[in-house]
From Swiss-Prot:
It comes from Macaca fascicularis (Crab-eating macaque). SUPFAM superfamilies: alpha/beta-Hydrolases (SSF53474). Its EC number is 3.1.2.2, 3.1.2.22. Residues 1-27 form the signal peptide. Belongs to the palmitoyl-protein thioesterase family. Keywords: Disulfide bond, Endoplasmic reticulum, Glycoprotein, Golgi apparatus, Hydrolase, Lysosome, Secreted, Signal. Interacts with CLN5, ATP5F1A and ATP5F1B. Its main location: other. This is Palmitoyl-protein thioesterase 1. The lineage of its organism: Eukaryota, Metazoa, Chordata, Craniata, Vertebrata.
């Protein structure tokens, strides 16, 4: 039989292990990865009927999550106006600075962009790898641009009337490129050379003028790149752009999928390699532009955020 002194020594020896086991048992589960949201044209960060509702839906399903809905400007009205008239490259630079300063994002974050916010957040992923973006979810984003005039119902309709006239007059003029957001992802398939040489945003992030290896490396670092396409979209033209497809070069009638584009076959962004590795996710839903049901959102989007 062991002596009392031996038992005492054994208890002392086991004490650290017992304390460690108790500490591990009481550790809180890891916090969910933060989420950064970028709204679309004519919207704002905190509209209770759009981004505000999305934020609440995410918080409902993922308790404790930190959600940053980006506000581009000092007021909600300025945020809306900037979605039409503030140079996209300037917006991306500002967002990169905001994310870099946010202590809650430094270990990584997921990103979800709505409509034009989808391609804007892709620019963030390509240009600003720190803090790291883990998953990018593009909801109706136009990654090959648009070649159709925007339709804006309601209060923004007069702005879109102005945009139509301006794009028709000269989408690739320097003054229009610098001051009109929608011109910066205007992609004319009939004038590919003009687009390639004068688009100050989309042609750059799609590697149309040359290969920036850091863009490719940074995009390929994503765990998942999710693209949501709206099958009855009446705003985005062509709708295939939501899955990185576009018009076949030289005309504006026949569209081709991503896999048939030169961007993919030449693998200028690493999309072919990502596709083969299962990093690209293509989702489709019925409905018009950005018309999502809660049930569909919970079933198909939340799994990439939890």
């Amino acid at each position: 039989m062991a002596s009392p002194s031996c038992l005492w020594l054994l208890a002392v020896a086991l004490l650290p292990w017992t304390c460690a086991a108790r500490a591990l048992h009481h550790l809180d589960p890891p916090a969910p990865l933060p989420l950064v949201i970028w709204h679309g044209m004519g919207d704002s960060c905190c509209n209770p009927l759009s981004m505000g509702a999305i934020k609440k839906m995410v918080e409902k399903k993922i308790p404790g999550i930190y959600v940053l809905s980006l506000e581009i400007g000092k007021t909600l009205m300025e945020d809306v106006e900037n979605s039409f008239f503030l140079n996209v490259n300037s917006q991306v630079t500002t967002v990169c600075q905001t994310l870099a300063k946010d202590p809650k994002l430094q270990q990584g974050y997921n990103a979800m962009g709505f409509s034009q916010g989808g391609q804007f957040l892709r620019a963030v992923a390509q240009r600003c790898p720190s803090p790291p973006m883990i998953n990018l979810i593009s909801v109706g984003g136009q990654h090959q641009g648009v070649f159709g005039l925007p339709r804006c119902p309601g209060e923004s309709s007069h702005i879109c009337d102005f945009i139509r006239k301006t794009l028709n007059a000269g989408a690739y003029s320097k003054v229009v490129q610098e001051r009109l957001v929608q011109a910066e992802y205007w992609h004319d398939p009939i004038k590919e050379d003009v687009y390639r040489n004068h688009s100050i945003f989309l042609a750059d992030i799609n590697q149309e003028r040359g290969i920036n290896e850091s863009y490719k490396k940074n995009l390929m670092a994503l765990k998942k790149f999710v693209m949501v396409k709206f099958l009855n979209d009446s705003i985005v033209d062509p709708v295939d752009s939501e899955w990185f497809g576009f018009y076949r070069s030289g005309q504006a009638k026949e569209t081709i999928p991503l896999q048939e584009t030169s961007l993919y076959t030449q693998d200028r962004l690493g999309l072919k390699e990502m596709d083969n590795a299962g990093q690209l996710v293509f989702l489709a839903t019925e409905g018009d532009h950005l018309q999502l049901s809660e049930e569909w959102f919970y079933a198909h989007i939340i799994p990439f955020l939890g």
